[in-house]
Amino acid sequence: LFNEQSPRGPDYNDGHDFWTEEQRMDVYQQWIHKTRYARYLEEFQRRENWGETVSRYTGFFEDRLDLKLTEFGRAILDLDVMPSMRCLMTAGKALERDACAGYNCSYLPIDSPRAFDEIMYVLMCGTGVGFSVERQYINQLPEVAEEFHDTDTVIVVRDSKIGWATAVREMVSLLYSGRVPKWDLSRVRQAGSRLKTFGGRASGPEPIDKLFKHMVSIFTHAKGRKLNSLECHDLVCYIGEAVVVGGVRRSATISLSNLTDDRMRHAKSGQWFIENGQRSLANNSVAYTEMPDTGAFLREWTSLYESKSGERGIFNRQAAKDMVPERRDNNYDFGVNPCSEILLRPREFCNLSEIVCRPNDTLATIRKKVTQATWIGTIQATLTDFRYLSAPWKRNTEEERLLGVSLTGIMDCPAILHASDKELQGLRDHAVKENVSAAKLLGIPESAAITCVKPSGTVSQLVNSSSGIHPRHSSHFIRRVRNDKKDPISQAMIEAGVPYHSDPRNDGSWVFEFGMKSPKGAITRHDITALQHLDIWKRFALNWCEHKPSITVSVRENEWVE
């Protein structure tokens, strides 16, 4: 509980009454906090409560920037706005060491062998990665050697994020030259060991051992030619599969490919989830660079329908260039983050913050939250001292200082759901104005793009709101979550009587089941049609977003032709 024993003491609350998670959060919200964002306090032999987590986050930036963030801390504490949840998790020594860990979003094309180890590092920092296997990029890769032979070279994998990334870099370099090395994993700590700086528990040596075996297989099958798009895609998926914390996957990616790329069009067709389960690690989208003819579009649309997975999705790069704000340089081939709400230059980061829209909010209270979320995002944008990565990452991130100020709970909040175009534009312009003020105070460039709507999968669960621009799933449903069997919280959940079973795909994890009930009168996915949902998306895309809204549309069988 947040009390006088807290590291920053009672003064943090600025005279407000102390409160516990039990007073503001139900058991599932507490689960999300404890398993995703709470750090272990050695001094007290327990995990943080919510107040201590918020205090650690605000204290990190107060000490770093010599600012007082009491108002913003209170807004986060009360679940009115949310910062980058990557920052919330890692604020402290972990974020001091790896600034990359404070960012939610990144993008890079697979145009260099270095792309693979940079992806490993970025994913291990907890940042989502968008990547492209379009031919104009993968054609820049070198040819794989014509012959392969085993060598006595040994890759010694050091037990750190940079250690793993460096090992991937060495492996790629050796395989391109036709040499198959041995690898030494003796320095990698055992599965279940607590990660004191970054948080969570170690995955052990097995994931990187499996990754190296897959890498050897892919490269040897490509001897004498360049890697094709699907091979590059699978390499990234295997890298993502290796990024595991405490037996639970911790990576998010999206893959962009050409319209005419049949390999990628059918990457998730048939029994792919059995034969190529690694492909579940990436969302797949086609990148349009011009208006396709009707036949080409219908072939892609039919493939999307027949896949039953909603993939490949559709990303129109030219439309993305046309929609960016005037102050942003659009002479770049933008890509996207895994949830596709942020437009990014190649090798660039973006941090997110979030406005929680409640049923009783008014435009005035939302405007105040816009101010708070924009300042929080701008403060987070000061983190640009990146380790390990190539120079363009720092250059692009510092030049644009991208923010992703998002709205969640839109369907719960009549004031924002039914806001006029002019009112949404006013809120967007207010965010831009507040960023100008914050950037001036902090001595950094103004942000090139600010507003978006992210899907808010985890944040909405933490704050108990509908997700982003989506309706609630149903009036009643079961939420299933995975957790490491060795985690003491798993045992606590079992003792508390939470239903559970073993994860059929991972013997090291339990699957816990939480019964969920939506608020009375909440809009659910059964209450709106696909076209109505898209109309709402369009209104927020045109009037609120300087990036774009991320949306998942539930399409009934009779709605596809419409």
Question: Model segments located where?
Answer:
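Extended catalytic cores of very large enzyme megasubunits
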Residues: L1-E562
